[in-house]
C-alpha cells in the first residue's frame, strides 16, 4: 500500500499522522516549562564539575599570579603524594571499623526496643539525641571528655585503677584512633538504630508468629525472616553511613586536627588543608575529582548490590 | 630720574618686605605643621572627606578586636565623622579571608591586620597596597622611625617597600617566680649541686638544670620547675627561636636545601621532649590558656609566653569584664621578667596594619591606620587592659603612665624593651604556612613519641618539596631577603 504524501512511517511500518501545529505548540510549551529546571540543574550540577576539571589542569594557588594550564602535573603529583594516599587509608580504616560497629550496635538496640517495653518512647527519644548534635560540637565535647586533666574518662579510669591517670587520648598514637572511633560511634549509632527500628517494625508479624509456632530458634527466625525483610533498609543505611564516614571531618578535626602528625588525617581534612589553608586550588581540584570518581564507583557498586538484594 | 630712582627703591623695599613676610609666614606654617602630630594630621586630612563614610577593617576576633570596637573605632568617628566597621576573624582564618576577598575583588575590606610573616605571600599576590606614597604625603616617616628597631627593621617592608605598620609588639618573654628563686634553702641546695647561683637561666642547659632541680625539690609542694605551652602551633614557634639561638640555620643559602634536620635541630627537639619530664603531666596538650592557668595558680616556677602573661600575672585590671576568663592570679608581685635563655626571643606572630589593594577608599583607610599607629594613639592603645596590643614603640617602654600600672610594670617594660632590640623573626617565605605546617606536624609527632631525627628528616623533605614547587630561585631570593634582616638570625 502506497503511503499517503506527507504521512510518516511508525516503527511498525504503519503510517503515523504528522504533528499538528497544535501538537508542536504543546510540545514546545512543555519544553519551555522544564527548560528553567534543566538550566538550573546544568548550572548547579554540570557547570561546577566542568569548571572543576578545567581548574585541575591549571596552576591556581591563590598566591601565585601565573595560573596558566600545566597539563597533567597535578595528576602526576596526586599519584606520588604519599600524604594523600595515607589520608585515604585512614578514611578507609575509620569506615572499616565504625560502619560494622554502628550497624551491629544499631541493630541490637533496635531489636531491644522493638518490644513494647515500659518507657520505650522516652528511651528512644534520649538515644536519638546524639544525632541532633552538630558533629563539630560533639567533637568539642568529646575533646573535653578525653581531656587529660579535667576529662571524666581519665577520672573514671583513675578510680577503677586506683591511681591518678593522665592518658593523652588525642596525642598518643595507640589511643587516638579509639578516641575518635568512640566519639564517632556514639554520635551515629542512633541513626542506624532509628532506621533499623523502623525497618523491624515493618516485618510481617504473622511470619514471626508462624516461625515461633513451628519451633524455629531466635537465630533461625532472625536469619531467615527478619534479615531478608530488613535487608534493603540495611543496605541503604550502610550506604548513607558509608558515604558519611568517607567525608568524616568534624569529629576528627575537633579532637586531633588530623594528628599526631598526619596519623588521623582523613581525605576530607587533607582536602580542606590543601584547598583552604594552603590554597593549592588546582591540586585540590584534582583531589576532588579523584574523590568524585572513587565515590561514584562505590555508590554505583553499592546500588547494584541493593538492586540485587531486591 | 631721581623720582624714578626713588620709586624703584621704594618698590624694591616693598618687594623685600613682602618676600620677608612671606618667608616668615611660610616658616611659621611649616613649624606649626611639623609640630602637629601624625595623629592630628591624619584626623585633619580625614575630616575633609570622611563624613558619612565607613571604613571596614579586618581584626583578630576576641580580645584584640575590643580595641577598635570599644576604643579606637568610636574615637575615630568622634574625631572625623568616619564610621569604622570591624570584621572579626579568628587568627587561623585571617589569611584565607583576606586572600578570598582580594581574589573575589569585592573591595569589602579597606584596612587589614596582617601577621608580618604573611607579607611576602600577600604582596606577591598583590593584596596589599604599597604605603610609601601615603607615608610621604601624610608626613609619617619620622614617626615610623620611632618604632622599636626589631619591629621597624623586620616587620614593615617587603622588597624595600612599606606594606604594613608594625602595630603589636608580640614577643616571647621569660617569666619566673622571684619568690622561689630568692628562697635561701633552694639557693644553697642549687649552688651545692650545680656550682652556680640560682638565677633566671641564660642558656637552655641552665634552664634544664634549674627546671629539673625545682621540680625535684618543689613537687611535694605542688610546684613544677616550669611549664610551657606545648601545643604544636606554639611549640613550633619556640622551636624556631631555640633552633636559631643554638646556632641552627633553616636553609643552605646557596642550594636552598633545608638544613633544619641538622644535629642542632635534632638536639633541640630531643631536649624539648626531655624537658616535659619536669613539667606538669599532660603539658603536651597545654595551649595559651592551660599554661596561663597553671602559672597564675602558682604551680610552675618558670614559663615563656607573650607579653599579656606579665599583665595577667600582675593582676592588672583583673576586674575588667572582658578579662573575666583569666584565672585569678595568685602570684601578683612575685613575678620576674627576663629574656628567654639565649637572649633572642621569638617575635611570635604579631600584627601589622595594612591597606587592602582592592579597597575603594584607600586614602581614608590609610589615614585611619596612620592615626592608630601614631605615637599619640598607639601609646593609649597598648595600655588598654583588654585589647592584647603590646608595646612596640620606643616611647611605650618608657611611658610614665604605663610604668605606674602596677609595682613591677617598670621591670616588665624594661624586659620588653630589651626584647625589642634582639628579637628573632618568624620564618617568612612564599607559602610560609606550608613550612610552618610541616614543623607543626613534626612537633605533634614528637609528643607522640617519634624519633627526633626521623621527624626532622621528614620536615626537611617537606620543606624541600615545597621549595621545589614554589621554584628554588624564586624562594631563594625571598629567603635571602629575609635572612638579610637584622632579626633573622642572632648576631655571632
Identify the function of each model-found stretch:
Chain B
Residues 35-56, 77-78, 159-161, 214-222, ...:
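Immediate post-signal peptide segment of exported/extracytoplasmic ligand-binding proteins
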Residues 36-49, 116-173, 205, 235-238, ...:
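Hinge/lid segment of periplasmic solute-binding proteins
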Residues 39-43, 329-338, 383-446, 475-492:
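Long, aromatic- and glycine/proline-rich binding clefts that accommodate carbohydrate-like moieties
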Residues 41-49, 63-83, 179, 439:
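Short, polar/charged alpha-helical segment
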Residues 71-147, 164, 184, 294, ...:
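Extracytoplasmic "Venus flytrap"/periplasmic binding protein-like
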Residues 154-168, 172, 199-257, 300:
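Extracytoplasmic/periplasmic solute-binding protein
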Residues 160, 266, 270, 276-281, ...:
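Extracytoplasmic/periplasmic substrate-recognition and gating elements
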Residues 204-214, 248, 253-285, 332-336, ...:
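Glycine-centered hinge/linker elements that transmit conformational signals in sensory
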Amino acid at each position: 500500500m502506497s503511503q499517503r504524501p506527507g504521512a510518516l512511517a511508525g516503527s511498525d511500518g504503519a503510517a503515523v499522522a504528522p504533528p499538528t501545529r497544535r501538537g508542536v505548540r504543546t510540545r514546545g510549551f512543555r519544553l519551555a516549562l522544564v527548560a528553567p529546571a534543566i538550566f538550573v540543574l546544568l548550572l548547579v550540577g554540570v557547570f561546577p564539575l566542568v569548571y572543576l576539571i578545567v581548574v585541575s589542569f591549571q596552576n591556581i594557588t591563590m598566591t601565585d599570579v601565573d595560573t596558566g594550564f600545566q597539563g597533567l602535573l597535578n595528576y602526576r603529583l596526586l599519584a606520588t603524594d604519599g600524604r594523600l594516599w595515607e589520608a585515604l587509608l585512614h578514611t578507609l580504616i575509620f569506615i572499616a571499623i565504625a560502619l560494622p560497629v554502628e550497624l551491629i550496635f544499631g541493630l541490637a538496640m533496635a531489636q531491644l526496643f522493638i518490644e513494647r517495653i515500659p518507657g520505650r518512647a522516652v528511651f528512644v527519644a534520649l538515644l536519638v539525641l546524639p544525632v541532633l548534635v552538630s558533629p563539630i560540637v560533639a567533637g568539642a565535647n568529646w575533646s573535653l571528655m578525653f581531656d587529660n586533666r579535667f576529662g571524666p574518662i581519665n577520672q573514671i579510669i583513675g578510680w577503677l585503677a586506683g591511681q591518678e591517670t593522665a592518658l593523652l587520648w588525642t596525642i598518643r598514637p595507640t589511643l587516638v584512633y579509639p578516641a575518635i572511633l568512640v566519639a564517632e560511634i556514639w554520635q551515629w549509632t542512633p541513626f542506624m538504630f532509628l532506621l533499623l527500628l523502623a525497618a523491624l517494625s515493618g516485618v510481617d508479624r504473622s511470619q514471626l508468629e508462624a516461625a515461633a509456632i513451628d519451633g524455629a530458634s531466635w537465630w533461625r527466625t532472625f536469619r531467615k525472616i527478619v534479615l531478608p525483610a530488613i535487608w534493603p533498609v540495611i543496605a541503604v543505611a550502610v550506604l548513607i553511613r558509608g558515604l558519611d564516614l568517607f567525608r568524616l571531618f568534624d569529629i576528627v578535626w575537633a579532637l586531633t586536627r588530623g594528628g599526631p602528625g598526619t596519623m588521623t588525617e582523613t581525605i576530607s581534612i587533607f582536602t580542606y588543608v590543601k584547598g583552604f589553608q594552603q590554597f593549592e586550588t588546582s591540586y585540590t581540584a584534582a583531589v576532588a575529582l579523584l574523590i568524585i570518581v572513587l565515590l561514584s564507583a562505590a555508590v554505583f557498586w553499592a546500588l547494584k548490590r541493593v538492586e540485587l538484594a531486591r | 630720574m631721581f623720582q624714578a630712582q626713588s620709586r624703584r627703591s621704594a618698590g624694591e623695599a616693598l618687594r623685600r618686605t613682602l618676600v620677608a613676610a612671606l618667608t616668615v609666614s611660610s616658616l611659621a606654617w611649616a613649624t606649626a605643621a611639623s609640630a602637629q602630630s601624625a595623629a592630628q594630621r591624619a584626623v585633619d586630612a580625614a575630616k575633609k572627606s570622611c563624613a558619612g563614610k565607613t571604613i571596614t577593617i579586618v581584626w583578630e576576633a576576641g580580645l584584640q578586636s575590643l580595641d577598635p570596637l570599644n576604643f579606637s573605632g568610636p574615637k575615630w568617628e568622634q574625631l572625623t565623622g568616619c564610621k569604622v566597621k570591624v570584621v572579626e576573624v579568628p587568627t587561623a582564618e585571617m589569611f584565607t579571608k583576606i586572600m578570598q576577598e582580594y581574589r573575589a575583588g569585592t573591595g569589602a575590606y579597606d584596612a587589614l591586620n596582617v601577621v608580618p610573616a604573611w607579607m611576602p605571600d600577600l604582596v606577591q599576590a598583590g593584596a596589599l597596597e604599597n604605603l610609601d606614597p601615603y607615608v610621604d604625603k601624610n608626613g609619617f616617616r619620622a614617626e615610623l622611625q620611632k618604632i622599636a628597631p626589631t619591629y621597624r627593621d623586620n616587620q614593615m617592608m617587603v622588597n624595600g617597600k612599606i606594606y604594613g605598620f608594625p602595630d603589636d609588639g608580640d614577643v616571647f618573654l621569660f617569666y619566673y617566680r622571684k619568690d622561689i628563686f630568692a628562697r635561701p634553702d633552694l639557693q644553697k641546695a642549687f649552688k651545692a649541686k650545680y656550682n652556680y647561683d640560682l638565677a633566671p637561666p641564660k642558656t637552655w642547659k641552665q634552664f634544664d638544670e634549674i627546671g629539673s632541680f625545682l621540680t625535684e625539690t618543689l613537687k611535694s609542694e605542688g610546684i613544677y620547675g616550669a611549664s610551657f605551652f606545648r601545643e604544636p602551633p606554639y611549640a613550633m614557634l619556640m622551636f624556631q627561636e631555640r633552633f636559631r639561638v643554638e646556632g641552627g640555620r633553616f636553609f643552605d643559602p646557596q642550594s636552598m636545601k633545608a638544613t633544619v634536620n641538622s644535629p642542632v635541630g635534632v638536639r633541640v627537639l630531643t631536649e624539648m621532649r626531655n624537658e616535659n619530664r619536669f613539667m606538669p603531666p599532660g603539658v603536651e596538650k597545654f595551649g595559651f590558656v592551660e599554661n596561663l592557668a597553671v602559672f597564675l595558680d602558682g604551680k610552675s616556677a618558670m614559663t615563656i609566653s607573650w607579653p599579656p602573661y606579665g599583665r595577667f600575672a600582675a593582676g592588672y585590671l583583673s576586674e575588667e569584664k572582658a578579662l573575666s576568663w583569666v584565672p585569678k592570679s595568685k602570684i601578683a608581685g612575685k613575678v620576674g621578667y627576663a629574656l628567654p635563655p639565649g637572649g633572642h626571643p621569638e617575635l611570635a606572630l604579631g600584627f601589622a596594619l595594612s591597606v587592602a589593594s582592592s579597597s575603594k577608599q584607600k586614602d581614608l583607610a590609610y589615614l585611619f591606620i596612620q592615626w592608630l599607629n601614631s605615637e599619640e594613639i598607639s601609646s593609649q592603645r597598648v595600655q588598654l587592659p583588654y585589647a592584647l596590643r603590646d608595646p612596640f614603640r620606643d616611647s611605650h617602654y618608657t611611658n610614665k603612665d604605663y610604668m605606674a600600672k602596677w609595682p613591677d610594670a617598670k621591670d616588665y617594660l624594661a624586659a620588653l624593651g630589651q626584647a625589642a632590640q634582639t628579637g628573632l623573626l618568624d620564618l617568612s617565605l612564599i607559602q610560609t604556612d606550608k613550612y610552618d605546617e610541616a614543623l607543626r606536624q613534626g612537633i605533634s609527632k614528637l609528643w607522640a613519641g617519634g624519633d627526633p631525627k626521623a621527624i626532622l628528616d621528614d620536615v626537611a623533605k617537606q620543606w624541600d618539596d615545597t621549595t621545589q614547587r614554589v621554584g628554588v630561585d624564586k624562594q631563594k631570593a625571598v629567603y635571602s631577603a629575609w635572612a638579610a634582616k637584622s632579626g633573622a638570625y642572632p648576631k655571632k
